[in-house]
């Protein structure tokens, strides 16, 4: 199973590897993709998937009874996004690079926080255990004392207890303010 929803949001002129590059896996491969991230069409519920041939009838039964079909306007918008130029994606990615660099530097400047440079999407996943808090504790304190909403790493796996996830799909001003608020929280 490969979730490739962020396949168009890779930084530094790198390409996201795809399981489609391994023909021997095709009969075991499920790929999920959509318009929500690359074309900023969240909420439109428009996407596509690739399944092994023998699973397609079962998937069709599941989908026809649970989501039926996407409305016509969303389908036409999806076609327009695919047929149109990629200028908007490129502009968005340029902005995300600036925001990524801002949050990366800002997180690493915080006492007890260690963050790797995000390679794609619009999330940073820093380790916060050196602050004296695990990810869940850090998130609660950030919400209540700094007014910053972040997600504990445990939402992404049991081995991520020491981490939190920040989104940098916000303005530079909001990112800077969030970092400043968390810095004040950590240095009280």
Region spans (language model):
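PLP-dependent class I/II
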Residues: 1-188
């Amino acid at each position: 199973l490969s979730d490739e929803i962020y396949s168009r949001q890779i930084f530094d002129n790198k390409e996201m590897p795809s399981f489609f590059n391994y023909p021997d896996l095709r009969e075991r491969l499920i790929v999920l993709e959509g318009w929500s991230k690359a074309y900023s069409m969240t909420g439109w519920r428009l996407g596509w998937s690739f399944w092994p041939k023998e699973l397609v009838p079962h998937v069709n039964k599941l989908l026809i009874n649970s989501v039926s079909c996407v409305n016509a306007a969303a389908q036409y918008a999806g076609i327009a996004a695919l047929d149109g130029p990629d200028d908007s994606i490129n502009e968005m990615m340029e902005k995300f690079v600036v925001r990524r660099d801002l949050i990366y530097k800002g997180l690493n400047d915080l006492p007890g926080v260690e963050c790797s440079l995000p390679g794609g999407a619009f999330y940073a996943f820093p380790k916060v255990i050196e602050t004296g808090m695990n990810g869940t504790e850090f998130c609660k304190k950030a919400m209540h004392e700094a007014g910053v909403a972040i997600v504990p790493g445990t939402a992404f796996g049991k081995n991520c207890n020491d981490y939190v996830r920040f989104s940098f799909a916000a303005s530079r001003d909001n990112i800077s303010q969030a970092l400043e608020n968390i810095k004040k929280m950590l240095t009280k």
